[in-house]
Amino acid sequence: MWNSRHPRSRPSRRRGPFVLAALLLAIPPSACGGRDQQSQSQTLPETQVETTPQTTSSPEATEQRWEVFDRNNFDQSTTIENEWFPLQPGTQFIYEGSSVEGGKRLPHRVVFTVTDLTKVIDGVRTVVAWDRDYSAGELVETELALFAQDDDGNVWHLGQYPEEYEKGEFVDAPAWIAGFQNARPGISMKAKPEPGAPSYSQGWGPAVNWTDRAQVYRTGEETCVPVDCYEDVLVMEEFSEEEPGAFQLKYYAPGVGNVRVGWKGDDPSRETLKLVKLVQLSAEALADVRAEALKLEKRAYTLSKDVYAQTSPAEGP
């Protein structure tokens, strides 16, 4: 998720996803109904929704192609406590839903884990997240995604290393990392998302056609997913130059993170996801995750020689 285009990293697969379990456990559930069904007051269904005049957007309406990045504005970059996108090491999100591939709607599952690894990218120490994407039970993508929070509370996306698979066979590793091949950092989530504000870049990786942007779609929404029911939900719409007219909707609960994914417009994947499990991993489980993430990084140094191999190694606690 993700973010990956969290949650989806290929032009045809945008995920995300987007997280703070310790805080989440202290948040009381809203007064919604059952957990397995959408709240009756929910105004944005998980399937297609209509664009409203308040939130109509397009790549042409943006004010700037990428964001101004100041690497000196990251004094505590690995402490990511953004209200809408907190990232605490050991937090694991599991999403389930479906997406359309080859004209068929297939089960889709995403496992997004915040590791306890950090990695310096473009002069900023980032938090390493490990993201796995399954279609019809088969792994189609595994990815390392790199995030950091600036002193103003914005969460930045500084790159990612994805490995793509088809029928169990490795296909490609279209990595983009800020500072290489003209790639630039983008903002995954602003500290204070504002309705009506111009869209912003979530990262710029021209070598692999990464041009994702985000904009506030709606605020103050309610939604129910298997994990819980949430109020005051922020809904963001994401789009890219490669998919004009296709929008992914991501639902963010305060203090939690991404809890739902939907779509609108001409999105060929029509991806829908709901948060079905949220856990804080044990020390042993987190160590296992760290080991697997480091295995993925080791492959990255071999498969992405011009990009990832030029970075310094990830570091553990």
Regions found by a protein language model. Give the residues of each.
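Bacterial N-terminal signal peptides that target proteins for export
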Residues: 2-19
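Intrinsically disordered, low-complexity repeat/linker tracts enriched for polar/charged residues
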Residues: 11, 38-50, 54, 60
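Hydrophobic helical h-region of N-terminal Sec-dependent signal peptides
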Residues: 19-25
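C-terminal motif of bacterial Sec signal peptides marking the signal peptidase cleavage site
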Residues: 28-31
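Bacterial signal peptide processing site
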Residues: 33-36
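Conserved functional acidic sites
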Residues: 49, 53-317
